[in-house]
Amino acid sequence: DSVASRGLGDVYKRQGFMKYLTIFVFSISAFLSATDYKYQPEPNKAEYYIGKFNSGKDMDALVSWGEMFVDWSAENNWRQSTTTVIMSTYFDDSISESDYVWLNIIPNAKEQYTSLETWLEVGTDMLSTLPVTNERVIDTIQWPISSPANTDSDNGIVRFSDCKMNEGVTARDMFDAYKEFDAKAKSMGDNLGRKMIFPFAGAGTIDYDFVYSLYGSSMEDFGFAVDNYGENLALSDEAMKMNSMVECGNSRVLTTNRIQRGEL
């Protein structure tokens, strides 16, 4: 079961332009026809900002800046439907490569790019006070599979994994399989959210098809789900079908701090 601190794909590894273009094409064209598929993705957009603290700055400085950023956004009526999360790497094979991941989740591309234009016009003073240096900015299309039932907590945990589909498997096939597994997991007490993430720009050349995100609103829920998978779900028909369609690896775990909840 499960982008963030090494660039969405290495975030953070790399492959050719044609495959990258193919991912984009199926991400868009998949919405045009639901024939032969049980579930319909409802995509959103997400921006992943990854980098290092400026000299003398730390996570507290970034969180403080984030709180000012949320106030600025409200005063300027900017991206009020956007959810913003600050993440910090916990388990990773290259933990020193980045200090943070800043995530913006936006409902659609029109709102994303319209608001970016506004940010470039009126947000420069705010940007000049940023206590970090972004080393990679990744634009993605996301297919949410599910969300945790309890969303009151602003603190949580997420695991990202790079996934490559087996021959003949499409993204829509994978989405249906994940939906079926998620329903099975929920019936066994699981309370995690899941999504498929397709890097669109900024990830470089990649050697995977998508990034799988598994996230919880609490450490307890996440730990329960890990145990529950091994004890009750790993040999289920839904899990075996899902795992037969895809190979996932390069997993990394980050803690999450939601500083703005989108008003959808």
Positions of PLM-derived features:
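Single conserved hydrophobic/aromatic residue that forms the stacking wall/gate
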Residues: 1-15
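Intrinsically disordered, low-complexity serine/threonine-rich segments
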Residues: 5-8, 30-32, 254
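N-terminal hydrophobic targeting signals that begin at the initiator methionine
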Residues: 18-19
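Hydrophobic h-region of N-terminal signal peptides that target proteins for export
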Residues: 23-34
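Short S/T/G/P-rich N-terminal loop/turn motif that feeds into the first structured element of a domain
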Residues: 33-264
